Each structure stands twice: as structure tokens, then as C-alpha cells.
């Protein structure tokens, strides 16, 4: 994006918001949520579903908040692992691969790499390439999973929902942490975090976090290696003006594996045998995934005397990805697999900008908490692609060291996307009633430029997204709600003729109930929903062109319980039922269920802290995850076997024996070392689940 164009867009948006502020004369403070005095709410607060801090009990949408304490206790080393005990989510789409954070929401896998947000701004990955971004959980404060369409506030997004990440911010109380860890598969690493004020007046605070991690992947000899650093600074310019600066520098010089194997040989025997779940079908000299991510951004906010506030968020990112992969391409004979080659070099730059104005006004007995916003996204990705072939490999007795039969340049492209959105939200409160209305208008431009063949395709579209929701707060902590919302997802995918596909559109009806016992520390929720999406971009095999296949419908039920059963016992439990099927498609796919979408999922995590006695400081925890009803392909030829995984943690706070700030923890995931296939894209590409992982860590907090 040219600098002058970006400056023009930013200035135009700032002027529009500034003009709105000039006419604002409302007296109420924007950050306070109005509640009836007789309703006592101790609800956790979310902002992903509304862009404003709102108690979850007052939010007429399914939201799960995964705290740092939760995902650290469970030993999560990626965002997808951190949400694995969350309803409505399937985070095992590619099994043991840790390269990307694939997160399937309410059965929708398309765009699952592009529904992640950091500090309110889209991560801006390109799903039509290998340039998909990740943030290590070490740098996160919490994770919100917002289920259902969110286009009314965010524009293009999956109808299944979004994942909203919140980074760790500078604190004016000095402190820090150092952590060392090691485990099986040669896992090892270190992390640190330090924060505190930089001046005596506590106007400026800084934070610096960093980590490194290394491991042999499940598919030897591939490795996983990561280095990341996040500096941030908070400046209280005045009592009413605050500036937050942040940067994120991330390097994965080794990205592990990301490949599948045939259904025959993984799920069921082939020629009387099964392939090992550690089998590597590639060539070490030719398999490589190297990702560099650099982000820098700011958030500036000002509170006016009349209680209204204005804020601007901006983030710029630049990524560079190199991919070389030798992959299996079906059985050649009784023991050997054909092999192909895929290579890519990519450079991507993107800007995400969001301007917001919010405040409150009363109209009679109704309080309106208003949010007006203008956001802008611009992404450009330059890609060069190669394909080729390698000699076959024996899947049961592999011999490595082969050279390619050929490698050929097949594409040199530029993918461009630009989105400008104007949105309005009104959160109304009247007695115990809560009404939410929202609308958004988007202008979206998508271009695919084929430099190799000197051609291009363009798509310019406008879209209107809406939301309407109603919730009632009973004084016993029960809150039933009903909502309607829409979604749209413009794409850079093209058909076999090079034409960019039409944006996917979705609509959802959702009904649910939330319950928070007064005076307690528990949250319970239940939701039923139906989502219909049209113009879906998909392909049946990796080499096939993308196409629009019509309409898909997802219906489901989600249950969640988060409870502190006592001062020592914590419970997290969830159940998900998902029925997602093609409603309008080819005759072969009509009525069939989508891949990557389990019919049933259930999970529970229970932990216990010993508060007194000889074992004071000890934490014991265990979790169980059950998955059932994953189909093998789009024709539903087979259903994968159900699987159950057991996880556990043992922690010890050594402060109880006088070693203040020191703690130790042991995490074991897949305790029984279950061999299973997590999902299949087709009968040609199925993905082994992760084997047992054992990691011990020692931390010192100061």
C-alpha cells in the first residue's frame, strides 16, 4: 500500500470521528456498563463480541474466556492447544502439525486461519497461501472464543466465529518471571517476562517478554524451532489520554510437518499393515518451513469531559515465508507411496486500522451505550510457487536420500485485499432487559495478479452486515437470550479460469441461556444455533481449482461449565454437538457432512490445589477429551474411529517451603500415548494426532 494512500485513509477516518466527537454532548461515562441496581453481576468481562468491555452475562452471544491461568496449567504451547477444552471448537484439524493455529468453529474450517484477532485487530493472514500468522501463548493474557458471526463489527470473518487474543500489557507494579522447560522428543526452551514503571510519577511503564523453543517433531527428522520477542510500552500522556505501543518479532526457522497420508494405511490397514504415526514421507534435504513475522502497532485513547471516548488502533506487519515440501501422493503399489513436491516463497505486508468512538446517552428509561467505528485493512502478498515430483518411498521400510525427478516454476502471483468498513452498535439497557442492535457497511476489493502469464482478476463488492439480539437478566443469575447475525467472507480464491470467487455469506439464529449463581464464582451456558452459508470456496484435492459449491448448513448444541467448586477445586467442562451438511452442492455431496467437523465432542478438566498440611502448594489436575463422528471425506465414505485423550498436570509452589516465587510443573498430554487419526481432508490426506508429550518446567516469579 503506498504511504500517501495510507495517510489519506487514516486522516479521512480521523476527521470523520473527530467531527462526530465535536457534536457529542452526552453526560455519561463511556466505560461504565449500566445495570439495574437489583441485579448483582460478578461476571467475567469480554470485549471480543462487542468491542467494548461487557460482562459476559449481559452478552447475547456465546463467548468462552480462556484465562492465562487455564492455558498455562494445561501446558498449552499454541493457541489451538489453549482452546482444546472449549465448546464449539475443533483444534485438531491437522493433527500433530504445530505449524498453524487451525481452529474450526461450529464446523466451519474454511478461513479458519483467518479468524484470529490480536488486541482487536485482524491478524491479516492470507488463506490462499502459506502466509498464516501465529502468536505464541507466552505473550497472551487471555483468549476469547466468540462463536457465531462477528462481521457486524469486524467485517470479513468466518460465520463460525472468531478467536480474540489479548496480549500482555505493561504494568505499573514491577515484576517478572523466568521459565525453563524440557521434555521428551528433545523439547527444551526458555522464556522471560519483565514489567514495571519507568519513572517516579508512574506515567510510563514498559514490558519485555521473550521466549525460545526447540523440539524434534513427531515426524523425525523434522524439527520445530521458535524465537519470539514482544516489547511494549504504556504512556499515560494525561489523566485522560493513554498511548500503548507494541511490537512482536517472531521467527520459526523450523516449522515441523504439515502433510497427510492415505486413509488406507493410517485409519485401516493397507496390504496387511499400518503406517507408523511417526513416519516421514519427505526428504530432510528438501523439507523446510521458515516463517518470519514482524508486527508493530499502537493504541491511543482519549476520554472527554462528557464521558465519551475516542481511540485508534493500528498495526503494520511484514512476513516472509519459505516452504519446501515433499509429500505423499497416493499408493503406487503394495508398499510404496508416490511423492510430489511443493515449494513457495512469499512476502506479505499488511495494515489494519480501527477508529472508534463510544459513549452513553439516555432516552427516557433506556440507556444506550453507542459505538461508532471506521476500520481499514490492506494486505498485499507476493508469492512464487513451484511443483515437482520425487521418486516413490516405501511407507513401511523407508530409505531416504532421493533426488527430485523435476522441480518446475508454476506461479508468480500477487494477492491484494482492501477493506473499508463503517459500523454502528447500540447496546441498550432497560430495567433487566438488554437489547443489542448493530449494522455495518463494507467496501471490499480483491485482486489476483498472475505475473507469470500477465493476467489478473478483480472483485469489488459492497456488503451490509447486521445483528439484533435480546437478553433478559433474572435476579437469580439466569439470562436467556435470542440473536440473529450475518457474516461475509471475501476471498482471494479463484476458479479454474482465474476469476475471483464471490464472497461467502452467512446468517445465524442462536438461542441460549447463561447462568451465574449470585455470590458464586461459576458460569454455566447453553446454546443452540443454525448457520447457513452460501458461495463456499473449497477444493477436493490440493491440486484442484477452487469453486463455489452452493450452501452449507450447520446446526448444533453447546454446553459449558466453568466453576470453582471450592477454594481448592476448579472445573472446566464442555459438550458440543455439530451437524454441518452441504445443502446445495453436486449430487455426490448433497446432504453430506463436512470434513474437520466432529459430530460429538466432550471434555472436562479438574484441578485441585492443596492449601494446607505437608503437601501445601501442590496442584493436581487432569483432563479428558472425547471426539466422535469425524468423516473421512466430503462424500462421507467412512467415519473415523472415535478417540479419547487424557491429559494431566502436577505442579508445586515452592513458596510453601521458603523458596518464594519458585514453582515447578509437569504436564503430560495424551497420557496413554493413544495412536489415532485426528481428521482427513479426503481419502488421500489423513492426519495423525499428536503422540504423548511430557514437559517439565521450573519458573521463578519476582
Curated annotation (Swiss-Prot):
Xref: InterPro entries: Plug_dom (IPR012910), Plug_dom_sf (IPR037066), TonB-dep_rcpt-like (IPR039426), TonB-dep_rcpt_b-brl (IPR000531), TonB_rcpt_b-brl_sf (IPR036942), TonB_sidphr_rcpt (IPR010105)
Domain TBDR beta-barrel: from-to ranges: 173-702
Top-level lineage group: Bacteria
A single cellular component GO annotation: cell outer membrane
Localization in the cell: Cell outer membrane
Membrane topology of the entry: Multi-pass membrane protein
Main location per the UniProt record: membrane
Pfam families: Plug, TonB_dep_Rec_b-barrel
Domain TBDR plug: 55-168
Keywords: Cell outer membrane, Ion transport, Iron, Iron transport, Membrane, Receptor, Signal, TonB box, Transmembrane, Transmembrane beta strand, Transport
PANTHER family listed in its UniProt record: FERRICHROME IRON RECEPTOR-RELATED, FERRICHROME OUTER MEMBRANE TRANSPORTER_PHAGE RECEPTOR
Job of this protein: Ferrioxamine binding and uptake, in association with the TonB protein. May play a role in intestinal colonization.
Family: Belongs to the TonB-dependent receptor family.
Protein name (database record): Ferrioxamine B receptor
Source organism per UniProt: Salmonella typhimurium (strain SL1344)
The encoding gene: foxA
